[in-house]
């Protein structure tokens, strides 16, 4: 077994035991390549454990502040699993009773395969629908304790997703003109433009295509891509509700128990 496989098994056990995902030096990934290899192995373990199938990918750290805060020099990616993806609304229980985070994002649905370096126009042509989405995140341990490579291996705090109704009429090239409004318990916590995501949400997709190509992976028709936080993560305590809305894309909701 490789170090990446050992790291994946250890992280999987931490998830099942609901313990902090801290790794011994003997199995901790040594670089980004090992971190992503461990994450891909973890996705296989989680799928076999009933969490799958994989339905796509998320892109994270899509602005300079997020990258600086987490010690990264570029965005990151992680897999999305169908077992914790919901349509329109969801009611989720906080695993540790401390609440969950929610990020306001856009979701893209792929119509064509995509891999390696591509232009924004190529990326737009490969998309057949757009939706608003929430990425649900769980910060199980502080970033400075975990470290970037372990965070990537563990899925970059990914806990689940809520995806709105797919809109097939929007031109993906115009997504930089989209605004979203995130409310928590009826109070607006953020109203932000999609340009918060690398200047244009499609830049997240072009980055992801190139990054996946480094590991001989590709986006496939039907894959869902979360493009990164437009409104930064807002914490929801048990009993709170978040609502995300955008003109032309409808609204979605999340309750935390």
Regions found by a protein language model. Name each.
Residues 2-200, 237, 241, 251-257:
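Catalytic-core "active-site belt" of small-molecule-metabolizing enzymes
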Residues 184-185, 227, 247:
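Short strand-turn-strand beta-turns centered on an Asx-Gly dipeptide
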Residues 204-233:
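A conserved acidic, glycine/proline-rich C-terminal tail/linker
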Residues 230-234, 248-251:
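Short, charged beta-turn/beta-strand-edge "cap" motif at the junction between a beta-strand
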């Amino acid at each position: 077994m490789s170090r990446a496989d050992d790291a994946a098994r250890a992280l999987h056990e931490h998830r099942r035991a609901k313990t902090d995902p801290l790794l011994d030096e003997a199995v901790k990934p040594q670089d980004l390549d090992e971190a992503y290899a461990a994450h891909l192995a973890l996705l296989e373990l989680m799928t076999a454990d009933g969490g799958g199938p994989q339905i796509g990918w998320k892109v994270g750290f899509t602005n300079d502040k997020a990258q600086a805060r987490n010690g990264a020099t570029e965005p990151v990616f992680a897999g999305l699993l169908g077992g914790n993806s919901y349509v329109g609304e969801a009611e989720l229980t906080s695993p540790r009773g401390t609440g969950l985070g929610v990020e306001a994002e856009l979701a893209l649905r792929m119509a064509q395969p995509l891999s390696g370096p591509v232009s924004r126009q190529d990326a737009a042509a490969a998309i057949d629908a757009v939706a608003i989405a929430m990425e649900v995140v769980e910060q199980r341990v502080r970033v400075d304790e975990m470290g970037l490579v372990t965070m990537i291996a563990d899925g970059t705090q990914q806990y689940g997703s809520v995806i709105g109704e797919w809109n097939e009429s929007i031109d993906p090239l115009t997504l930089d003109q989209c605004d979203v409004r995130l409310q928590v318990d009826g109070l607006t916590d953020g109203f932000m433009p999609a340009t918060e995501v690398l200047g244009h949400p499609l830049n997240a997709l072009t980055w992801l295509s190139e990054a996946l190509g480094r590991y001989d992976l590709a986006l496939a028709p039907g894959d869902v891509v979360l493009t990164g936080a437009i409104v930064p993560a807002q914490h929801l305590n048990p009993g709170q509700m978040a609502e995300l809305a955008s003109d032309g894309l409808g609204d979605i909701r999340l309750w935390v128990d």
